[in-house]
Every structure is written in structure tokens, then in C-alpha cells.
Amino acid sequence: MQVQLETLSNLERRMNIALPMAAIETQVAERLKRVARGAKIQGFRPGKAPLKIVEMNYGAQVREEVMGEQVQQGFYKAVTEQSLRVAGYPRFEPVAAGDDKESFKFAATFEIYPEVKVGELAGKEIEKPNTVVGDAEIEKTIDILRKQRTRYNRVEREAAEGDRVIIDFKGAIDGVAFEGGSSENFPFVLGQGQMLAEFEAGIVGAKEGDIKTVEVNFPEDYHGKDVAGKTAVFEILVKNVAEATLPEVNEEFAKALGISDGDVEKMRGEIRKNVEREVKRRLQARIKENVMQALIDATELELPKALVSLEIGRLVEQARRDMQQRGMNVKDMPFPPELFAAQAERRVKLGLILSEIVEANKLEAKPEQVRAMITEFADSYEQPEDVLAWYYESADRLEGPTSMVLEDNVVEFVLSQANVVAKDLSFDELMGSQA
């Protein structure tokens, strides 16, 4: 086998390979003999057709298979001998042999992995947020849980903020009805911003049975482009006004949250445990994101186009599956690759950087770390032992937790090298507005 390597760019290579035709012909002949043993050809008993007849029927197919295998084997043998790390898949193409009838020549164009030099981390400032969970945060969480179980009771009074109203409405712009401008038996809660402020203001103070005429100015940046910047007149029939009633924090409430004996203090303890677990998870996610961004900012790296393209394909397929699971018809929906390019580039770059840090510093996910992570995850289920056992039934199931532990170890390593700046983060900032 003869090999000639060309450098086309920093990462792109072209390898010209010549394989001995005699070896290929030997492989073809041996393969045809094996095929002949079971070949079913009209006019002959199975396996009894002459080799020439077998070659006439199967020769082209066998030759194509052998050539494909020889090209693959020849290429990967050549890159191994030259210590090249191929990124993505090579592109093969035949090369005219000319007067050389004793060789089969082909070219492989491919990219190699870049040399990764992680930027200086010593002194790199990385923010590490911290959030304290106190009694006030537990009470706030209980209030959120109460609001999620709000009951609405019909009242015979004027509608006020916080009430749920049920209405019929018809809207028109310049006297012409427009798409999405009418509905019947439409429920919403006043003051939650579900409707435009002018629309809601026209209902506040109305009673059941009232008919209100309300003028609404749609903002210029309104999501409905057909009505953005225009003025509509709505005729609104108020069909029901209901007042919100929150459940009391008592035995019944505790039972509704899964506390079988209705012990309120036990309920608070469970809520605290769940909140602390969620706060820990979100803090870890923020710290990890800060570390990853620091690594990206500190490292200049040319990315193999092949890896980015493969990652775009994965992201597109993931987006397609997510939409299908939400009941959307994605059969003819376009997924422009450029929409996923930035995310793909970031993921590829991070993957290369993390691999380099792991290899250079001999980091590993220890079995006890993996077990601790799975145990912590399993504790959020009613039968944690079953969850733990499920993971350890198959090595494949351990791959996800193992990768996560390895990432966590990279984060800890980077933090040990960098200048970590502590920052207090309020509960609301960390969790987002949930009220």
C-alpha cells in the first residue's frame, strides 16, 4: 500500500492511497467462492452453479463490497500509521490509475482534530453564586403551592384584580372582525397580564351580565403582526365573576401534598428538603455554566467543520423530536442549519476543551462518585432503591451519570485553578419569579 499525504489547510488533509490490485482480486475470488456455496441461480441446484455463472450474477456486487471494505481498511490503517486523529467522516473518491494497472487508487479528504491548548486559568475570575434557604423561602414556596391549588367561587359583585372572569368578546378594527379577535366562554384572571392592560381595565368594576365596550391600542411590537400598532374595539359580555380562595395550611393541605398522616411540620420538612435540593441543583448549574464560559473565553480554537456539521444534525433531530412530542406536525417543517450553528459550535468547542482537560490532568469519574450522584437523584422518587437498581442493571445506563460526574470533576479542577469570586444570590433571583 502506497500513501501520500497532502495538507490542504490547518485541519484539512488529503490522502492519496494506492492498494495492490492483486490483493483485491484475491479477496474478490475468495468471496465469490463463499457466495457460490449457497447461491440460488435458476437452472442449477443451490450451491452447484459453476463459478463463472456465479461471477456473472454476483460479481459486480461482490467486487463493490470488497472494494468498499478495502478502501475503509486501507484508509484507517494509513491514518493509524501516521498517528492522525480523524474528525468526522472522510470523503472518498476514486483516482484514475493511468498506466498503472496493478493498483487501485483513491483519495480520502478529511479533517483532523485540532491541537487544544486551554488558556491560562490561574487568576481567571469565575463567579460562584450562593443562595441561603431560610424559613421565609419555605413560606414563599408554600404560598406558591397554595396558589397552584386556588379555588374560584362565584360572587355577585364587581370584578376586581385577582378575580377570575369568564367572558365572551368580539373585536373589530375599523368595523371589520379580525382573526383571533373573538372568543366565547374565555376564562382568565384579572391582574396576571394574560390580556392587554386596556382590555383588563375595561372589565374591572363590571358585574356578571354586564356588557362593556372597550377600546384597545395594540403595541407596535405586538406578536400579532396583522394588528400591531392598530386600535380595536371590543364588545365584552361578562358571564361569570369568581373570587379566589386559597387553601389553609392544615392537615388536608398536607395530605394533598403527599403527607399521609397530614402532619404539617413533616410537610414543611419535606418542602425544605425539596427546595434545598432544587437550590443546590440550580447553583451547580450556574457554577458549571460560569466555568464553561470561562473556558470558552480563554481558549482560541479552530473547529473541524465535520464535527460542527454532525452536531448540527443532532440538534436538528432533537428539535424535531421535541416538536413531535408536543404534538406538532414537523413533516414539511424546515429546520435551517444556520439556526443551530452557534449552539453546535459552542458544544463542539466545549467538548474538545473538556476532553483535553480530562486527558491532560488524568481526571476520572470514580465509582463512588457515580453511585453518590445516582443515589441523590433516586432520593427524589418514592422507591429510590428501585431507581438505583435500574441504573446498575446495565453499563449503558451508567454512561450518563458517569459523564456528568466527569464534567463536575472538570468544574472542580478549574475552580481550584481560578480566582473564585463568591456572590450572594437571592432565592428569587435563582429560582426566577414564581409568585
UniProtKB/Swiss-Prot annotation:
Known EC number: 5.2.1.8
Subcellular location per the Swiss-Prot or TrEMBL entry: Cytoplasm
Reaction(s) catalysed by this chain's protein: [protein]-peptidylproline (omega=180) = [protein]-peptidylproline (omega=0)
Annotated Gene Ontology cellular component terms: cytoplasm
GO MF annotations, alphabetized: peptidyl-prolyl cis-trans isomerase activity; protein folding chaperone; ribosome binding
One Pfam family named in its UniProt record: Trigger_N
Keyword Cytoplasm included in the entry's annotation: yes
Membrane-crossing residue ranges in chain numbering: none
BP term (GO), one: protein unfolding
InterPro entries linked: PPIase_dom_sf, PPIase_FKBP_dom, Trig_fac, Trigger_fac_C, Trigger_fac_C_sf, Trigger_fac_ribosome-bd_bac, Trigger_fac_ribosome-bd_sf, Trigger_fact/SurA_dom_sf
Family: Belongs to the FKBP-type PPIase family. Tig subfamily.
Domain notes from UniProt: Consists of 3 domains; the N-terminus binds the ribosome, the middle domain has PPIase activity, while the C-terminus has intrinsic chaperone activity on its own.
Function: Involved in protein export. Acts as a chaperone by maintaining the newly synthesized protein in an open conformation. Functions as a peptidyl-prolyl cis-trans isomerase.
Protein name per the record: Trigger factor
